Amino acid sequence: MPKQRKTRARPVARRVYSFEQGAADGHRGMKELLGGKGANLAEMCNLGLPVPPGFTISTEVCSAYYEHGKRFPAGLEQEVERALARLERATGKGFGSRDNPLLVSVRSGARVSMPGMMDTVLNLGLNDATAAALAKRSGNPRFAFDAYRRFVQMYGDVVLGIKPASSMERDPFDVVLDELELARGSQHGKGLSADDFAGLVAAFKAIVRERTGRPFPEDPREQLWGAIGAVFGSWQNERAIAYRALNNIPSSWGTAVNIVAMVFGNLGASSGTGVAFTRDPSTGEKRFYGEYLIDAQGEDVVAGLRTPQPIATLEKALPKAWKELLAIQARLERHYRDMQDIEFTIEDGKLYMLQCRTGKRTGFAAVRIAVEMVREKRISSDEALLRIDPDSLNQLLQPVFVPAELAAARGAGRRLTRGLNAGPGAASGRIVYSARDAEHRAAAGERVVLVRIETSPEDIRGMQAAVGILTSRGGMTSHAALVARQMGKVCVAGAGELDIHYGDRVVAVDGQRLHEGDWISLDGSNGDVYAGQIATQPSPVAAALLLDDKAAQRSPLYKSFAQILAWADRARTLRVRTNADQPDQCTVAVAFGAEGIGLCRTEHMFFEGDKITPMREMILSESTAERERAL
C-alpha cells in the first residue's frame, strides 16, 4: 500500500487590514475587498495624509456572514483582536480602559458609494466607567457625556433597532432630547450642561430597557461585535436593497466594515467637522465647495440635523486647519484625477481626513467637469466620455420656469422662502409629507413634492417618486442634497423658515399655511420656494437644439454638451438612427444627432384622432375602388 502524502491545511485568506498615517495593508486598487471607504482610507495613509488609525474587515466576511446564517466565520475574532491591539499601540489608548479609553467608529463601505444607505455607529466603547475616564482626561465632562448620549442613541437605533414606527412618527430619543432643550431654552444641544447630557444618557438607557427588555450593553467588546453585525446586516436593509435596485448594484458584492479610532469635532470652538467637494457638485465649477460645523460630529452635517456654514468661512474660523485642508483637497484631486468628496474632522485645531471618494454630481456638473479636466490635460477625451453616465445627460434637458410666469408669481407675493439650491431644474407638485405617500400618489399619476424636516435613507423610494424635494434642515452636503443630485431631482434644502408639522400635515411660513395636496414650486437654480404652480419651459440645451435659440447656443452649458457629443461622434464606430412614429419626433431626433430613422411604427400615426375610421374602411374594403375611396 503506497504511503499517503501529508497535505498542509490551506491557510485562511486574510480578512482584516490595518492602516495608519504613512502605512497601510491595502491601497485604492482593493475596492472589491476593502470597499471604497477602506481602500481610500488606506490610500490616504499611503500618501502620508493625516488619517486616524484603524482597520477594515473585508467584504468577503460579509459574504461568509450571510452564507453561514448571519454568523461570523471561525477565526475572525482573533484577527480583530490582533488589529485592535495594533490600534491601541498606534493611539496609546486602551479599548475599555478606565484611564485613557479608546473609542472607535464602526462604518460600512461598499465598493461603490451608497450614501446613507447603510449604518454607522460613532463613539463606540463608552460606558459609565469609560465616560468618567474620558471626562477626567479631557477635562471636559460636557464633551464626554455629549459623546455618551450620542452613542447610546445611535447604538439603540442601529444595533438594537429602536426606531420610529413610521416616517410620520418621531424618534423616541429625539422626543426626550427636544423636551429637555425646550425646558432649557436650548437648540442643537448648545444650551445643555454636562449634567443635562448625563441625564439624557440615563433617560436613553431607560428607553433601551423599556423597548428591548434588556439593559444597555456596558462591555465594549460586546458593543463592538454588535455594531459589526449591524453593519453587515444593513447590507440587506430595505433602503440599501432599494438603492441597489435603482443603481444596478449587485447584491453579491457585500460591504466591508471600517473600525477607526474616534477623533472629536465636538470638543469646543477649536474643533469641528465638515464635508466638502473639490469642485461644485451641482454646477461643476472649479472651486472648493462644502460645509462645516464648529463643535459638532460628522453625523450632524450629513444627517442635516443643523444647517452648516459654507466651507470658505473656515478660513477665518480656523485658519491653520483651512490652509492644510485646501492643500489636501487639491492633492487628492490631482492624485485621483477626478472630483473628490471628502469628510474631515478638526480636533482641537488638528485636521484629520475621514474619507475621500469620487463625488456624486449632477448631469450639469458631470459634463462641465469632464470637459474642463480634458482642457486641464488631466484626462483624455475618451476618459471624459467614460466618466459621464448617459442617463445623467437627461438632467441637462430638465425644464426651467417660464420667466414671465416666474415674474408673475413674485409679483403676486407667492415666494415663500429661499433655501439652498441642492438639485437641478424647476418643478411644481402637490405637497406630501411622507415617502410612502409620495410613492402612492406618484403611482396614481400625480406630480408630488416631498416635504420633510430632513430626509433619511428610509425615504429613498419616495424621493425617487417625487418630482422635487424640500427640507427645512440640512445643507448642500446633507442626505437630501446628495441623493437628489445623483437622481437628478429638483431639491431645495435647509429652508429654515419652514415650520413643518407632520401630525397636522401642514407647513407654515411667513404667515401662510400650506396643507397636504396644495401645489408648491421649487426653483433648483437659486433655492426659491413658491406657493402654487408655475409653468416651465425647455432647458438651455433643449432650446439651443430644438428652437435654434442663439442665446442658449452661447451658454457654457450648451457648449460643454456640444463638446461631449463631438467627442462621442469621433469615438463611436456605429451609426445612430432613431425610432420615431411622428414627424415631430423625427425633428427632435435629428436635432439631437440621429442620422436617420431606424424604425417607424405606422400604426401609431393611424390611431390618432379621426384617422382610425378611414383605416378601418380601407381594411374592410371589398374592392380596389372602395379602398382608394377610403384613403
Predicted regions and their residues:
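Nucleotide/phosphate-binding sheet-loop regions of phosphoryl- and nucleotidyl-transfer enzymes
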Residues: P2-R410, A442, E446-V449, S456-R461, ...
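Long, charged amphipathic helices and adjacent flexible linkers at domain junctions
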Residues: R244-I249, L385-R441, E446-V448, D528-R572
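A generic local structural motif
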Residues: A435-A438, T455-P457, T477, V507-A508, ...
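Structural loop-to-beta junction motif characteristic of Rossmann-like glycosyltransferase folds
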Residues: G488-V490
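Aromatic/His-enriched, Gly/Pro-containing loop or helix-boundary segments
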Residues: G503-G511
